[in-house]
Amino acid sequence: MEPLNGPHIMTSALFLGIDTGGTYTDAVLYSETEGVLASAKALTTRHDLAVGVSGAVETVLSEVGGAVSRIRLVSLSTTLATNALVEGQGGRAGLVMIGFGPQDLARDGLAEALGTDPVIYLSGGHNVHGNETPLDLAPLEAQIDALSEEVSAVAIAGYFAVRNPAHEIAVRDLVRRRTSLPVTCSHDLSSRLGGPRRALTTLLNARLISMVARLIDATSGYLASRGIEAPLMVVRGDGALISAAEALMRPIETILSGPAASLVGARHLTGLDNAVVSDIGGTTTDVAVLDGGIPRLDGEGATVGRYRTMVEAVAMHTFGLGGDSELRLEEGGFEAGLTLGPRRLMPLSLAAHLWPQPVLAGLERQAQAGFPGRYDGRFALRTGLPKALAAGLTPQEASLYERITLEPQPLDVVLTSTSQRATLDRLVARGLVLIAGFTPSDAMHVLGRQDQWNAEAARLGAEVFCRRKAGSGRPVADSPAELAERVSARLTRQSAEAVLTALLADEGISGIDVAKSAFIDRALTRAPGLIRFGIRPDRPLVALGASAPVHYPAVADMLDIESFVPVHAGVANAVGAVVGQVRETVTVFVTEPDEGRYAVNGAGEHQIFKNRADAFARARDLAGTEARLAAIRSGADHPVVELSDHIDMPVIEGLEKLVEARFIATASGRPRIAAG
């Protein structure tokens, strides 16, 4: 918590920013005239997110006198959706594909993302001009009851639905009549062509609905209990704000919400217009670039983990590297190679802080054993998700899940056969079970650089890990301190590699594997030789995250770059959440399916005009009107609309032929705030 000299008495309007990450929930109280007045952190409580939210918010409220009655806006950013995709988690969802076939699953990673979740194919869809192929609902009607028993949400993707959404709407209405499941339509998420990738985006959105709903419900419930009557906003992946109601319908847009908020916060806290921003959290490190004070956007759609979506978001490069990253021993080598991530574990020091007896007892038993065991230093516990989210488990998964409790148990007790390890991994992927193990956070406790949790558990965890053997037969390390120093060095190196990987990608330089390049290795280690290698970013590094002051001075030194760690670096996401704007963009298309006939498609509308000027006028008006309405729905007070167009109309044999016209309207403004 950032301390103040006694309760701060305020008379002006206050904004409350909240960021819910995988490990911590942050809160800030912000005034447009005085900046950050108070900030605090509390552990994120996945089984009941309201506990973490209330813990952080109550602390900042206690620092500012009369704050509750002065709060006019609450804004929320989160890394939960990002972390879920990085770690392969999310609820089970059913996919309904209209006009597609099984062969389309092979494109854009859709089959991999779908996994064992059910898919139903329907005849139907439209062509590029919005003309339909007849829709056959019979297969869905026959399977809908069974489907509703095994999934938590439904995703619908229709062929060329962005040009005519009628079939997606018909399927959506049927699902809503027959079930109470949340439904996502692809045309509501993107106006871009590319059916399989739009289907992928829709599927991921459906999987995230329950997770984001739990966060918004927890936050809303807490605010109501405290009598805080202010609009609740959520940060989108491009840094803009949307209302909580809109976020519930389009949770996929909150992927990279936390990182986007951190970029907005970094600009606000440092005043730097041009910078490389690296935000290290518990689960991920997120790297992006500020150009002229504005985050670079990813024109191809946000990539998170293995998936490239159609969500417009900051050009953020997300790496499975953080303070809670899994420490892994690279098997097979003569020397003991260590690597971090991409999976997040609960640090042993945190697990013992929350449950001292079972964790310390388990580690002490393993440390005193005659020889190291395969599962030493690992514990399993339930995340506490509602029982409904455990639907669709196989008998083997259900049996193992029943044996796992809300309190950590050693893996060598939980697992009775090696085949159960794969079963456990599936439960982890569903977000039902969390593994505790040795992480960089534990290493920092061993070295005395962090002290907020149980240092004895960290030391015992390091001792147990040290007993593992490299290919040479030697132990991984001779002491807990040696192991911890190696983990710290590994985190520094992988963090530097993450920054370079992101910058090379932004420069369009491909074909260089930073982790394997001898050139990069010589540059980062500054190894002596006949040739001196060097590599240096052209702008300063802004380091964010609670552990940034611990890790990033060494990262900046390795990169030979000037660095800044702002005063409120640990809560930059929460700051960014309250200083952003609402921004909505709507695109309407005009095509010429036949000579003298002009099709207007977009914003849920399909119309035919005989006059090109009339079609253009309708498209321009529709885009502007819908963008303004969308901004108002998303919580803007007085949105300002900007219009642009791109008309592709070549002259062929002396005649103009319309290929496509795009009319783009963007409405933006500050969010509405509660009356004083």
Name the predicted role of every residue range.
Residues E2-G676:
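N-terminally biased helix-coil "hinge/interface" segments that flank
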